[in-house]
């Protein structure tokens, strides 16, 4: 079964790139055509690269790896936090602090400081060893730490993989990952540099629905990897008898429904494949809206 369908990519606007004047020539091989001054990404290639990235993330997690979800732009913040939390992975969705990977020892100290502040009962002024003003300052410090480091509170070492939304905005994360030889899986819009990414996924990194879809796909890969890891640890290949976590149950139920719909999907596949060129013809009005949004 495919990880994601052509119809899902089209409906989410994954094929819309940037304006033709804002592009990276290295992305030329991923571009299908141009409409109303906007590049249209080749979704056939996107499907192939999604499958490749999915298998890599799944295998990495199955062997004990951790995926750090990174996306601080407004369109990605909610999806990054939601999907990473769903599969128990760390995330950064507010601000990338310089040295978060390359100077992880210092970051770990700040995380420890955050956990210490969380032990304070800020409402019990009389029972604490602090004055009201000191408690106010400590609460502000805690709020700032939770905003910047809350998503990586359980990260004890450098992650195995980075999932990044918008490599241009998250260039600090990309640079640090390259220094530590950490593989990067990322959405590549038409203004990005594909040479910076180990597992690129050509697509729209500005539309909320596109970011949501691709981030969910990566989270599903993590979920499958965690299930495989658990089965390897228990020496079983069947689903465990104990109650499954919510994300495991959703994933397995989703797999069953996809298998049940396989015959219908097989009939729709040829039609969906033909929709990619047709979509390019039908995007004139939508491309105009995307132009205004960019």
Swiss-Prot record:
Region (Disordered): 232-294
Pfam families linked: Ribosomal_S2
GO CC, alphabetical: cytosolic small ribosomal subunit
Highest taxon of source: Bacteria
Record carries keyword Phosphoprotein: no
Biased composition (Low complexity): 260-294
GO biological process: translation
One example GO MF annotation: structural constituent of ribosome
HAMAP family membership: Ribosomal_uS2_B
Family, per entry: Belongs to the universal ribosomal protein uS2 family.
UniProt name for this protein: Small ribosomal subunit protein uS2
Biological classification of the source: Bacteria, Bacillati, Actinomycetota, Actinomycetes, Micrococcales
Encoding gene, per UniProt annotation: rpsB
């Amino acid at each position: 079964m495919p990880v994601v369908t052509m119809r899902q990519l089209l409906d989410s606007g994954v094929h819309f790139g940037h304006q033709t004047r804002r592009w990276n020539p290295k992305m030329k091989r991923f571009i299908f055509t141009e409409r109303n001054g906007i590049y249209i990404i080749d979704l056939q290639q996107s499907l192939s690269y999604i499958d490749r990235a999915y298998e890599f993330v799944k295998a990495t997690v199955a062997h004990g790896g951790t995926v750090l979800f990174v996306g601080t732009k407004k369109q990605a913040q909610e999806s990054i936090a939601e999907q990473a939390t769903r599969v128990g992975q760390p995330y950064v969705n507010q601000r990338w602090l310089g040295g978060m990977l390359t100077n992880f020892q210092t970051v770990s100290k700040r995380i420890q400081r955050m956990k210490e502040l969380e032990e304070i009962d800020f409402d019990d002024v009389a029972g604490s060893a602090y004055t009201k003003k000191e408690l106010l300052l400590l609460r502000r410090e805690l709020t700032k730490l939770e905003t910047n480091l809350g998503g990586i509170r359980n990260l004890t070492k450098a992650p195995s993989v980075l999932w990044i939304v918008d490599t241009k905005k998250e260039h600090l994360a990309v640079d640090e990952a390259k220094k530590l030889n950490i593989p990067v899986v990322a959405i590549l819009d038409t203004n990005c540099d594909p040479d910076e990414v180990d597992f690129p996924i050509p697509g729209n990194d500005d539309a909320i629905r596109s970011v949501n879809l691709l981030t969910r796909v990566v989270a599903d890969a993590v979920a499958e990897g965690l299930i495989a890891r658990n089965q390897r640890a228990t020496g079983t290949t069947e689903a465990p008898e104990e109650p499954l976590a919510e994300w495991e149950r959703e994933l397995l139920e989703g797999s069953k429904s996809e298998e049940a719909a396989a015959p219908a999907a097989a009939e729709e596949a040829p039609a969906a494949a033909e929709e990619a060129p047709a979509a390019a013809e039908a995007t004139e009005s939508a491309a105009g809206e995307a132009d205004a949004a960019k």
